């Protein structure tokens, strides 16, 4: 008994000792650590212990040393024995004035958990075209990382779609939505180092920093030169770059080409396929962009092979039609003869074809009796003659009216014998397959199959294609294959520069050369520069660049990149290199750099007025006012329309040409920008947990940020305790969340303030060549004509005050869109600035926005369901207004072209009557000036301004050697004259003379000297001296289908000219009426001729002799004319 009591006492003492030890240990632990910090990237907690024994840097600072090409980040590790720093304080500890108190280490010496992802637990959070965003966990701490390499991430969660490697071509972000569809080559994660409260620690490659992550659309960047070439088969151009690696691709605006970028080093050759020559594709190479000219490969090949021979070119170009004609001849003669002769021997083939096509044959035969043009006797097809063939539809031997009742297909009797059988019976099958209609159809199918077999064996083109060497491409103009490599950047300094007050001393390493010169640095640069490289930067580039150099390091210097094609300054070049490094410092500067475009890819094909497709109309003056002929012109306000007017008062020898061309018509909208919205790609969460206290206690260590904050209390109770925390109904978890936005899919929301109809109208002819913008608000007026718009906006889909969205595809969308600062559940949330900073969101998260979890033994966790408002998914309810992409001007207005009529364009033209009279004497032309600028042998030509004074009013023809002109006739008035003329010259017209022929009279001609010509040869793909391009353009103009159509309608110009704006419509109506009239008369003539032949009326009748004149031997009357001596002829068959 005593032993049992002794054992009981020992157990109680042991339990008491264990309990006391636990309490003491917990007290000691609580003194050492007050709480835990958990940071979540997405759904994963990241834990920092704020204990004195286990320190983790709560702040970082970067100290930069002076080096030549790149700068190294240094992090300071600061010890904080107290609690965690408040969020509103600086996220980095300021550098102390005493360098001896700092502990400075290299970033490369710090343990980088992002680089050890293969041996740690990691998860892929996002994959872009050029890098990856992921998180790794080490000792309960989760680190957020962005890397340009996929090495070591194969074992991470969500790595199924992770590529083996990312492209290394340099890219920079695009912020302007209208540039995305032209230059977008994918997306990339960038770090924005802005001085805002929403920053958090992030590591890019191996460089730690504080900022926010966003997914941006990117474009290519770099120095690239496109080598000109004669654009002929095999349609190859060459590109070169001095950089170590460069990217290029061929892109059609709006096309998704994020994985089609091709990298090269040094030089590369590009061969264009036929689909790339449609005039819509662009060649993008680094900063350069070039429009691939529209080229009809088939036409160009024929023109090159049969140059200077228009007949051979026509035969080669139209060879596809010749092939069809040949096949048609083969089908209708030998193949048809062969099919007809083998019908019976090949009965098995026709039975098989009939079995395959039986449903079609059955349907055609059953519907035949309802066909309006069938023969009334036997059912054959009858369109013109209304006569039947000898064999009817049921293969009767002769045609007769009784066949209709005998043939089951044409019979309408319900009790026919065949109605007893099913449609699928053998009786019906034999009947259907053996009808005349079915046999004719099966024969036709057989002929087509034989023709297709023969067609496939014929050559596709008469023009031979040139083959390239195996594995190489020929570069036109170069006799060799160029594979030169450029020198790489040096790994260490090669020179030394010492800037003094009065001189500069330069020393070249490895030599004994020392150069001394005067101090010619930039003036008024007041900043401290101690190291040698700082002095050099201050001297040559200024203090602004030195500030970037010190505070914004370049991890990759890109020393070969000059940015010359964009015209970047030294500061702009440095910022562009920072963007290449994946760092965004300022969205305003970024937008400026990404908005720069080098090349002609955005240039529209500004061709001259297409006179070959415009209708021609003779125009009569309406009245005479003050000695001037007044012409009243009215046209439909539709883009691409126009008219060529021929003016003549019946006194002048030649008509005067006056052309009106409406180049484009649309609506100019003035808008007010509201906000930007984008989808949420991931969420960053930062929270802090306490064992005791409430939200106020928690906020002492985790301060409020102002938006998207949350707090959960109580968090400590039975069953929800961390180790050594025995509080009941105590504790709190507080923090905030920040979203990572996919700016690649962002929409910008605008409010429409005003709409105005705008038309670009080009005038050519006797008034010279000029294009003017006319609006509905302000009529256009000059000395010779007036123009105004009669607006009609009832078809416009955008109303004033409506909210519209400008999408990443540059299209305009409308629908239910949330207004600014409106939490309604419509498309438009989150509401952001251009750089992805929220401007309207939830101040405090609610219970439905997150979930909180804990365990009896373990850490607490917070999962964010929705960080703020998110209605981006409602974008599917938006409606695209137009298929035409638009570009905004300073985010305040845009122009949207319309494909329908917006009203009427009314013009009043007053021309002096002297223009239509022969000049009485040679005019006196003084103060002449003719200046031109542009390119030779190109689509744009030379834009010239002709100015002079005249003492007479007259009409004149103009010409100049080796040049074609946009207009060959001018209306000259008395006094000052000014004309815009476009010249297309094969040689430089500088110092040549333009000749004016008043009223076409060479005896009183006047010469004007070309004063100045500025030739600006653009760097693009096609060479400006491409003679084949000129021949192709000439051929297309001469053989245009529109030109042929206008030629057919031209006989009706005079009548149609009296109907004003209905000119072209009347011409078409008259042409159709003329065709019907001719067809009707031809039908009557055919019927008369057929009756004449059928009745043998052409045979001679016996002659009739007159008793009174027996001496007359020649027959005067024919037998068929003696209608009184024979019964009347039956002409019922002609009806």
From Swiss-Prot:
A motif (Cell attachment site) lies at residues 41-43. One of its GO terms (cellular component) is virion membrane. Residues 177-195 are annotated as: Non-covalent dimerization. It comes from the Viruses. Keywords: Disulfide bond, Fusion of virus membrane with host endosomal membrane, Fusion of virus membrane with host membrane, Glycoprotein, Host endoplasmic reticulum, Host Golgi apparatus, Host membrane, Host-virus interaction, Membrane, Signal, Transmembrane, Transmembrane helix, Viral attachment to host cell, Viral penetration into host cytoplasm, Virion, Virus entry into host cell. Residues 36-314, 485-1067 are lumenal. Residues 1-35 form the signal peptide. One of its GO terms (biological process) is fusion of virus membrane with host endosome membrane. Pfam families: Bunya_G1 (PF03557). Disulfide bonds join 114-145, 122-156, 224-285. The record marks 484-485 as: Cleavage. Residues 437-484 are annotated as: Signal for signal peptide peptidase. Glycans are attached at residues 116, 210, 605, 980. Residues 367-484, 1089-1135 are cytoplasmic. InterPro entries: Bunya_G1, M_poly_TospoV. The chain crosses the membrane at residues 315-366, 1068-1088. The cell attachment site present in these glycoproteins may help in the adhesion of virus to cells. Tospoviruses are transmitted from plant to plant by thrips as the insect vector. Belongs to the tospovirus envelope glycoprotein family. This is Envelopment polyprotein. It comes from Tomato spotted wilt virus (strain Brazilian Br-01) (TSWV). The lineage of its organism: Viruses, Riboviria, Orthornavirae, Negarnaviricota, Polyploviricotina. The gene is GP.
């Amino acid at each position: 008994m005593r032993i049992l009591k002794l054992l009981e006492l020992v157990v109680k003492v042991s339990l008491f000792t264990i309990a006391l030890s636990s309490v003491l240990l917990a007290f000691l632990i609580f003194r050492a650590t007050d709480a835990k910090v958990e940071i979540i990237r997405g759904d994963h907690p990241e834990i920092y212990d704020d204990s004195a024994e286990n320190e983790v840097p709560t702040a970082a600072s970067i100290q930069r040393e002076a080096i030549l090409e790149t700068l190294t980040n240094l992090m300071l590790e600061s010890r904080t024995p107290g609690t965690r720093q408040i969020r509103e304080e600086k996220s980095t500890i300021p550098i102390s004035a005493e360098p001896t108190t700092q502990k400075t280490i290299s970033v490369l010496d710090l343990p980088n958990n992002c680089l050890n992802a293969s041996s740690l637990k990691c998860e892929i959070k996002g994959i872009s075209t050029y890098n990856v965003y992921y998180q790794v966990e080490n000792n309960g701490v989760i680190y957020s990382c962005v890397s340009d390499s996929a090495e070591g991430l194969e074992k991470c969660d969500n790595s199924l779609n992770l590529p083996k490697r990312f492209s290394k071509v340099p890219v920079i972000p695009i912020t302007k939505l209208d540039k995305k569809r032209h230059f977008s080559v994918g997306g990339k994660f960038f770090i924005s180092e802005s001085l805002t409260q929403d920053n958090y620690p992030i590591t890019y490659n191996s460089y730690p920093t504080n900022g926010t992550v966003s997914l941006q659309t990117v474009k290519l960047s770099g120095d690239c030169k496109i080598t000109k070439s004669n654009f002929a088969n095999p349609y190859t151009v060459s590109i070169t770059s001095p950089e170590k690696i460069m990217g290029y691709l061929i892109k059609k605006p709006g096309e998704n080409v994020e994985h089609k970028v091709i990298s090269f080093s040094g030089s590369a050759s590009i061969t264009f396929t036929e689909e790339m020559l449609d005039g819509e594709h662009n060649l993008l190479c680094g900063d350069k962009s070039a429009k691939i000219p529209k080229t009809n490969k088939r036409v160009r090949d024929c023109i090159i092979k049969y140059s200077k021979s228009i007949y051979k070119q026509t035969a080669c170009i139209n060879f596809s039609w010749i092939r069809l004609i040949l096949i048609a001849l083969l089908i209708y003669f030998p193949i048809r003869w062969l099919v007809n002769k083998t019908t019976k021997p090949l009965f098995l083939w026709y039975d098989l074809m009939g079995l395959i096509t039986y449903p079609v044959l059955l349907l055609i035969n059953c519907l035949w009796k309802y066909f309006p043009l069938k023969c009334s006797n036997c059912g054959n097809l009858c369109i013109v003659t209304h006569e039947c063939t000898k064999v009817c539809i049921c293969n009767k031997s002769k045609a007769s009216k009784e066949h209709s009742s005998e043939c089951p297909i044409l019979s309408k009797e319900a009790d026919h014998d065949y109605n007893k059988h099913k449609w699928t019976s053998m009786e019906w099958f034999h009947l259907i397959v053996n009808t005349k209609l079915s046999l004719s159809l099966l024969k036709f199918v057989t002929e087509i199959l034989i023709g297709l077999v023969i067609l496939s064996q014929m050559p596709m083109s008469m023009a031979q294609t040139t083959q390239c060497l195996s594995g190489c491409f020929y570069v036109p103009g170069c006799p060799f294959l160029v594979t030169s490599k450029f020198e790489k950047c040096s790994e260490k300094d090669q020179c030394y520069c010492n800037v003094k007050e009065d001189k500069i001393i330069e020393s070249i390493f490895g030599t004994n050369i020392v150069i001394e010169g005067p101090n010619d640095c930039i003036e008024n640069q007041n900043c401290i520069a101690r190291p040698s490289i700082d002095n050099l930067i201050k001297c040559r580039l200024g203090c602004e660049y030195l500030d970037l150099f010190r505070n914004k390091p370049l991890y990759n210097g890109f020393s070969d990149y000059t940015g010359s094609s964009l015209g970047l300054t030294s500061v702009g070049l440095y910022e562009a290199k920072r963007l290449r490094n994946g760092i965004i410092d300022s969205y305003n500067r970024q937008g400026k750099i990404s908005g720069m475009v080098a090349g002609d890819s955005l240039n529209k094909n500004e061709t001259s007025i297409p006179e070959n497709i415009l209708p021609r109309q003779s125009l009569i003056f309406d009245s005479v006012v003050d000695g001037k002929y007044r012409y009243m012109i009215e046209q439909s306000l539709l883009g691409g329309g126009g008219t060529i007017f021929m003016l003549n008062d019946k006194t002048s020898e030649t008509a005067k040409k006056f052309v009106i061309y409406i180049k484009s018509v649309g609506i100019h909208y003035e808008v007010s920008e509201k906000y930007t919205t984008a989808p949420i790609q991931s969420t960053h969460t930062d929270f802090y947990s306490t064992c005791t206290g409430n939200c106020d206690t928690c906020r002492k260590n985790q301060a409020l940020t102002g938006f998207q904050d949350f707090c959960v209390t109580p968090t400590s109770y039975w069953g929800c305790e961390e180790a050594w925390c025995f509080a009941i109904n105590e504790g709190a978890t507080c923090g905030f969340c920040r979203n990572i936005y996919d700016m690649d899919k962002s929409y910008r929301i605008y409010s429409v303030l005003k709409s105005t109809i705008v038309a670009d109208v080009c005038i050519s002819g006797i008034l010279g060549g000029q294009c003017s913008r006319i609006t509905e608000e302000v009529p256009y007026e000059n000395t010779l004509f007036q123009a105004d718009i009669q607006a009609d906006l009832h078809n416009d889909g955008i109303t004033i005050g409506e909210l519209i969205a400008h999408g990443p595809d540059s299209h305009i969308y409308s629908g239910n869109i949330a207004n600014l600062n409106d939490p309604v559940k419509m498309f438009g949330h989150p509401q952001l600035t251009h750089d992805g900073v929220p401007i309207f969101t939830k101040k405090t998260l609610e219970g439905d926005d997150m979930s909180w979890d804990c365990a009896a033994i373990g850490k607490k966790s917070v999962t964010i369901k929705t960080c703020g408002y998110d209605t981006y998914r409602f974008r599917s309810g938006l409606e695209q207004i137009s298929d035409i992409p638009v570009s905004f001007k300073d985010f305040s207005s845009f122009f949207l072209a319309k494909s329908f009529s917006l009203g009427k364009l009314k013009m009043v033209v007053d021309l002096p009557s002297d223009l239509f009279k022969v000049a009485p004497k040679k005019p006196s032309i003084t103060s002449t000036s003719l200046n031109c600028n542009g390119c030779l042998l190109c689509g744009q030509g030379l834009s010239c301004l002709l100015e002079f004074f005249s003492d007479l009013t007259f009409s004149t023809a103009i010409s100049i050697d080796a040049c074609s002109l946009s207009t060959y006739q001018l209306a000259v008035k008395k006094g000052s004259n000014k004309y815009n003329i476009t010249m297309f010259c094969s040689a430089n017209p500088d110092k040549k003379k333009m000749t004016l022929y008043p009223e076409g009279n060479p005896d009183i001609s006047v010469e004007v000297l070309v004063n100045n010509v500025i030739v600006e040869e653009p760097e693009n793909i096609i060479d400006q001296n491409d003679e084949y391009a000129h021949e192709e353009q000439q051929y297309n103009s001469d053989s245009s289908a529109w030109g042929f159509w206008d030629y057919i309608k031209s006989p009706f110009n005079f009548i149609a000219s009296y109907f004003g704006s209905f000119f072209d419509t009347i011409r078409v109506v008259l042409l159709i009426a003329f065709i019907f009239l001719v067809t009707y008369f031809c039908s009557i003539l055919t019927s008369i001729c057929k009756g004449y032949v059928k009745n043998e009326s052409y045979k001679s009748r016996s002659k009739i002799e007159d008793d009174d004149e027996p001496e007359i031997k020649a027959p005067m009357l024919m037998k068929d004319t003696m209608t009184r001596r024979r019964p009347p002829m039956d002409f019922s068959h002609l009806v």
